[in-house]
């Protein structure tokens, strides 16, 4: 009887860990003897993957924010290189996490000649530079989640398949506002704003003080206002709660459950990233925030070539949802916008209608195949 295939999967952040775990569950259901190892977090571990490193707890972004963790990332990189050399997997699956995974792809292809699938494309459409040439030289197949990404790779001569966006299916089964409030134990008849500062430590440190001050200003106008704060699994809950202590605010903290928190809210303030797209797909009135270190901001101004930061705005190619970035990310601007937004009933209606059209455009896009089918097609026949 032939040996089962070996697959190594690398997901360095919580969202990628979650998406990768869903793939592993599907693979294990059909190929129970498949040997899967790699880098991931609690979701991949729960799915039965043998982990050699967990980088999800060190979620950072930016030039200066990463410095304290360089030794950790270097060790993880050396460990996964050694693991690949020893295991010689039939397939290497890289999930998002481009700063780490593109370097790994270059090594795995050049030194080991491994077959590589890259799921969730680096934002080559946002960054100036020549990342796409590295991808063309290293990756056997790109599995992209936005239709326009397929065109970019096809034009560059990179093998690519559009596999659909994982959030579309996830959001389709989300609870409505009433059910979400009941599920979370929130009052049904009070105004609620969800505050989502991000899942990285640097995002917590920069965003939460601004969100606390914004909440205080909004509460001055509406003392009945309640806030709900979902806390990512990568963050110590006590650290988040400490910012809100003795602030005379009505706040409910929820471990995880970000989608339910957004669904339960009347309005959402969300850090740019995956959660902002989740919020858009929920058709929830919102605004997007982001603040980085000065050095990261200056570098971004030089390298980034897109007009918007929020994924929903990028997809719509217009400012559908307001973005409060860097120096504009402050409690004065935020509280002023939110107060004006709710004083005009036409503004929420208009935003909801635009978000509904965006959701429809993503939902109606026909995927070439599923990620599962793409992976299975690249596995040796010995798994059958």
Curated annotation (Swiss-Prot):
Membrane-spanning residues: none
GO MF annotation terms: lipid-A-disaccharide synthase activity; phospholipid binding
Organism, as annotated: Legionella pneumophila (strain Paris)
SUPFAM superfamilies for this protein: UDP-Glycosyltransferase/glycogen phosphorylase
Protein name: Lipid-A-disaccharide synthase 1
Keywords, alphabetical: Glycosyltransferase, Lipid A biosynthesis, Lipid biosynthesis, Lipid metabolism, Transferase
Function: Condensation of UDP-2,3-diacylglucosamine and 2,3-diacylglucosamine-1-phosphate to form lipid A disaccharide, a precursor of lipid A, a phosphorylated glycolipid that anchors the lipopolysaccharide to the outer membrane of the cell.
Example GO BP: lipid A biosynthetic process
The protein's enzyme class: transferase
InterPro entries: Glyco_trans_19
Gene assigned in the entry: lpxB1
E.C. no: 2.4.1.182
Family membership: Belongs to the LpxB family.
């Amino acid at each position: 009887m032939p040996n089962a295939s070996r697959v190594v999967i690398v997901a360095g952040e919580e969202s990628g860990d979650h998406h990768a775990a869903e793939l592993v569950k599907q693979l294990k259901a059909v190929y129970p003897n498949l040997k899967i190892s790699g880098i991931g977090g609690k979701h991949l571990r729960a799915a039965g993957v043998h982990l050699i490193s967990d980088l999800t707890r060190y979620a950072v972004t930016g030039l200066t924010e990463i410095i304290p963790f360089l030794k950790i990332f270097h060790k993880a990189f050396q460990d996964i290189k050694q693991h690949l050399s020893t295991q010689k997997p039939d397939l290497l699956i890289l999930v998002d996490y481009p700063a780490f995974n593109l370097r790994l792809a270059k090594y795995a292809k050049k030194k080991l000649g491994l077959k590589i699938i890259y799921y969730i494309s680096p934002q080559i459409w946002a960054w100036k530079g020549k990342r796409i040439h590295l991808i063309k030289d290293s990756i056997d197949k790109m599995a992209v989640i936005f239709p326009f990404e397929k065109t970019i790779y096809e034009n560059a001569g990179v093998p690519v398949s559009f596999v659909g966006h994982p959030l579309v299916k996830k959001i389709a089964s989300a609870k409505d506002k009433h059910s979400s409030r009941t599920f979370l134990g929130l009052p049904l008849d009070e105004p609620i704003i969800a505050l989502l500062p991000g899942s990285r430590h640097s995002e917590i440190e920069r965003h939460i003080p601004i969100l606390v001050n914004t909440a205080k200003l909004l509460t001055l106008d509406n003392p009945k206002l309640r806030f709900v704060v979902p806390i990512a699994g990568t963050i110590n809950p006590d650290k988040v709660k400490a910012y809100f202590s003795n602030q005379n605010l009505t706040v409910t903290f929820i471990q995880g459950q970000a989608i339910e928190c957004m669904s339960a809210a009347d309005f959402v303030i969300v850090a740019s990233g995956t959660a902002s797209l989740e919020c858009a797909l929920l058709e929830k009135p919102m605004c997007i925030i982001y603040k980085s270190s000065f050095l990261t901001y200056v570098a971004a101004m030089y390298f980034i070539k897109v007009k918007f930061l929020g994924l929903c705005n990028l997809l719509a190619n217009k400012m559908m949802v307001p973005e409060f970035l860097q120096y504009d990310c402050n409690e004065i601007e935020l509280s002023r916008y939110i107060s004006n937004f709710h004083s005009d009933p036409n503004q929420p209606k208009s935003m909801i209608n635009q978000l509904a059209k965006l959701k429809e455009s993503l939902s109606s896009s026909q995927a070439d195949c599923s990620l599962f089918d793409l992976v299975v097609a690249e596995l040796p026949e010995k798994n059958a």
